[in-house]
């Protein structure tokens, strides 16, 4: 969608110049504050992209890496990790797309909460599938995790999203 495409550039709209002011708790140069629904939604879309990519990386690695004479993806524990990653991605995708359609700040808060969980937990699970390889420069998994952590604290934290959602029950 348009929200995901705009966030994929990772540019100023999602937190470039205005992101510094918002991260410090104030408004950025364009008056964009930490709870700006557009910035929250674009960050959620960026997190959704990370979640999807780490799920793809985990599945691909699970199919390629062999242990005990068969791919590690043949082991049920690895299959469950990968399946859980895909479920979180699809749940977050629905929330991000819905928030993009409605433009509602409460929907954006819910989308950010779900996308943050999908990105951070997905990157952790991907790292687990990769094992020690995930922390080497040969794999980008550790970069996805670090960036997901940073974006989870940008524009709207989980606590702020939960407060926004609770206030509108």
Predicted features along the sequence, with ranges:
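Alpha-helical interface subdomain recognition
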Residues: 40-169
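FAD-binding core of flavoproteins
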Residues: 1-56, 60
């Amino acid at each position: 969608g348009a929200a995901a495409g705009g966030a994929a550039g990772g540019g100023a709209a999602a937190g470039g110049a205005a992101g510094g002011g918002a991260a410090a708790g104030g408004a950025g140069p364009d008056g964009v504050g930490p709870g700006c629904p557009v910035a929250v939604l674009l960050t959620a879309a960026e997190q959704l992209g990370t979640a999807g990519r780490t799920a793809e990386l985990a599945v691909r690695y699970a199919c390629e890496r062999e242990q005990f004479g068969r791919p590690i993806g043949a082991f049920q524990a690895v299959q469950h990790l990968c399946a859980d990653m895909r479920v979180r991605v699809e749940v977050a995708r629905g929330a991000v797309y819905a928030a993009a359609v409605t433009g509602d700040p409460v929907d954006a808060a819910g989308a950010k909460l779900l996308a943050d969980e999908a990105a951070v937990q997905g990157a952790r699970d991907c790292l687990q599938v990769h094992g020690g390889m995930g922390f080497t420069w040969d794999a980008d998994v550790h970069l996805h995790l670090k960036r997901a952590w940073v974006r989870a604290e940008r524009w709207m934290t989980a606590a702020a999203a939960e407060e926004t959602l609770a206030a509108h029950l």
